[in-house]
């Protein structure tokens, strides 16, 4: 997965509310408002970087943009995660009209059908690579 820290900082500096997930038992997540001084450490529920401290946010009821970590994505938006289902469960709760963006390297965008899919998998609308944003045919 590409490093999105610079983009997070740029969005924050522009006044955009940036939130990062914290893993909870049962493959659930809460969200914490991100700022440049927020401490990040490997989580205790899932072995991924997540916020230490910070208050959980009430998420908006209007559509939002969600950047999803991914190991791969195909041309129609099928996303391969790490298999925990955290993001798939969360995406089910998003307001209609929300946009899903898979953060991947350019060589992790595959032709249609080359990424394994399950019925519950979240499908991305865009792939965000270091080379730019690419619309997917979801």
Regions picked out by a protein language model, each given a short descriptive name:
Residues 1, 71-75:
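Short glycine-rich anion-binding loops that position phosphate/pyrophosphate groups of nucleotides
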Residues 37, 52, 57, 61-66, ...:
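Surface-exposed, charge/polar-rich loops and edge strands
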Residues 20, 31, 80, 104-105:
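Aromatic-residue detector
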Residues 1-61:
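N-terminal active-site beta-alpha-beta segment that forms phosphate/nucleotide-binding
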Residues 18, 66-68:
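Conserved alpha/beta enzyme-core scaffold
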């Amino acid at each position: 997965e590409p490093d999105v820290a610079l983009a997070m900082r740029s969005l924050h500096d522009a006044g955009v509310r940036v939130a990062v997930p914290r893993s909870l038992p049962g493959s659930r997540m809460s969200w914490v408002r991100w700022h440049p001084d927020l401490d990040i450490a490997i989580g205790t529920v899932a072995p991924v970087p997540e916020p230490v401290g910070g208050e959980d946010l009430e998420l908006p009821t209007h559509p939002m943009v969600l950047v999803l970590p991914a190991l791969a994505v195909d041309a129609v938006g099928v996303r391969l995660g790490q298999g925990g289902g955290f993001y798939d469960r969360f995406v089910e709760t998003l307001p209609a009209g929300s946009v899903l963006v898979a953060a991947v390297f350019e060589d992790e965008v595959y032709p249609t059908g080359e990424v394994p899919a399950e019925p519950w998998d979240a499908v991305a609308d865009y792939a965000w690579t270091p080379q730019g944003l690419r619309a997917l045919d979801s």
